Amino acid sequence: MTKDFKISVSAALISALFSSPYAFAEEPEDGNDGIPRLSAVQISPNVDPKLGVGLYPAKPILRQENPKLPPRGPQGPEKKRARLAEAIQPQVLGGLDARAKGIHSIAIGATAEAAKPAAVAVGAGSIATGVNSVAIGPLSKALGDSAVTYGASSTAQKDGVAIGARASASDTGVAVGFNSKVDAQNSVAIGHSSHVAADHGYSIAIGDLSKTDRENSVSIGHESLNRQLTHLAAGTKDNDAVNVAQLKKEMAETLENARKETLAQSNDVLDAAKKHSNSVARTTLETAEEHANKKSAEALVSAKVYADSNSSHTLKTANSYTDVTVSSSTKKAISESNQYTDHKFSQLDNRLDKLDKRVDKGLASSAALNSLFQPYGVGKVNFTAGVGGYRSSQALAIGSGYRVNESVALKAGVAYAGSSNVMYNASFNIEW
């Protein structure tokens, strides 16, 4: 059995599976190197008997550069015959008007066309126009080199892959699923009606109806269809995704660190406030006490000296003039002396009264400041007012506070007791 015959039989058997009413097989011919070459074989009621195979007796029909062949299209008395299948070099064809034009190409199905070397078109109306392109399915189209389609009405451009009915892939794109569509280069759409838009290059749409909305992205839904990524491991590198457990852990650590930092700062502020408050209070008290004691001592000494002096003088005068009748001028001198002494004691009393009033106003201001409230709600700011009194003095206080969290709060206030008597305070509260 010759090599030509083996090729003829193999091609004929394949073509028989897709038998059409009309077919042809080109005669073997020798090339310049003397090696026989068989272009194509197809089995149908009309077969070239030179190939040595046939299913039904029929007259030879040869085509391709044979002027004796009838023209393509309707011919003979029936006038309804379709065009014959046509092939060039080693190919297999089947179906009405199938064409395999490239070397080593295959066209199977009515009007199927394999136009370039090593192209494969399988299915009625399928087209493979690129080198090494494959179109499988009715009306499928592989329109560029190395393009691959599988499914009815699927389409792929150069280096693209479209799998599924009506799937469409652009250059270097991959579309998998019914009606999936990739309009951008170097992108992937997987799922029913998934879509990567033309200006969203290097993107991926995964899942039914998923659509991309930017380049260099991965979408698992669309604007009104959101999905969850499940069973996601914790990320280990900077550009890894983070799962919920990992996020909760990081948030807990961040909050704990913030709490410790806030507590430390609060303690520092509280210590400083306490030291300042104690220092101011101590200084104020010491100054007031020192001033009062000094003034009292000065007044007492002045009064005593004056009293002693005047008493001695009066006594001497009295002794000198005991036996003398007291004149009106002497009475006047004694009266003036008494008035002067009384005046000095009156001044001392006024000073002591003023000191008492200042102390009373200070205590009233302190009472008013202590009546101010601090906020109870976390994150809340309050404004509060209060009054206070001590003996005959009264004071008005206003203040504001802020609660940082359940454990920490801040408060400050100022009190006014009349004239220039102003007192203020600031406090920091920690609870546990």
UniProtKB/Swiss-Prot annotation:
Coiled coil location = 242-263
In its UniProt record, a GO molecular function of this protein is:
collagen binding
**The keyword Transmembrane is annotated on this UniProt entry:** yes
Q: Which residues cross the membrane?
A: 379-389, 393-404, 411-417, 421-432
Region annotation Translocator domain: residue ranges?
A: 380-432
SUPFAM superfamilies from the UniProt entry: Adhesin YadA, collagen-binding domain (SSF101967), Pili subunits (SSF54523)
Keyword RNA-binding in record: no
CDD domains xrefs: LbR_YadA-like
Query: How far does the signal peptide extend, from start to end residue?
Result: 1-25
Spell out the Pfam families in the cross-references.
YadA_anchor, YadA_head, YadA_stalk
UniProt GO cellular component terms: cell outer membrane; cell surface
Q: What does this protein do?
A: Collagen-binding outer membrane protein forming a fibrillar matrix on the bacterial cell surface. Promotes attachment to eukaryotic cells and after invasion, is the major adhesin in infected tissue. Constitutes an alternative uptake pathway under conditions in which invasin synthesis is repressed.
Recorded protein name is Adhesin YadA
State which gene encodes it.
yadA
